[in-house]
């Protein structure tokens, strides 16, 4: 009986909505988080969760039990954030302050964040065992070669016309 504490930090910013039906990053994030949550309950661990965007959207304190896991799963599926941006540093700082006892933390995000979060990652990793899981959709960086298209930043709402014929060269030249 391990009885460890596991925390899920789940990015609920607008960029998670990218992807095809059944393949959106939000669905992948929910599947990853649910898998970790079920694994934690099998190991008799406490599980908690923080939903974050550019603010702390919801904090679910760590608890044990099947009922608690089902609540977490329901929240993963149904939760609607108030904000659209991303602030990973804020989420890590909140978790580090809220959870005093050393825990295993899974940070599940696409890591689309205009802020520098390296220092917060370093501090959180010293206090807790931190595992970062990047949810990625290759279509975000590989535009179809269709000419002029209008793109919208889902987090900031700004729009821009892009010539995808030339953008394809820039995006795929890693």
List PLM regions with ranges.
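Cofactor-binding loop segments of dinucleotide-utilizing enzymes, especially the Rossmann-like FAD-
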Residues: 52-54, 110, 135-137
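Conserved strand-to-helix beginnings and helix N-cap segments that scaffold or border functional pockets
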Residues: 22, 117-118
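An amphipathic, basic-hydrophobic helix/alpha-beta surface used to engage anionic
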Residues: 1-57, 104
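Short beta-strand-loop
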Residues: 46-75
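Von Willebrand factor
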Residues: 68-103, 115, 135-137
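Active-site flanking residues adjacent to catalytic metal/cofactor-binding acidic residues
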Residues: 10, 109, 133
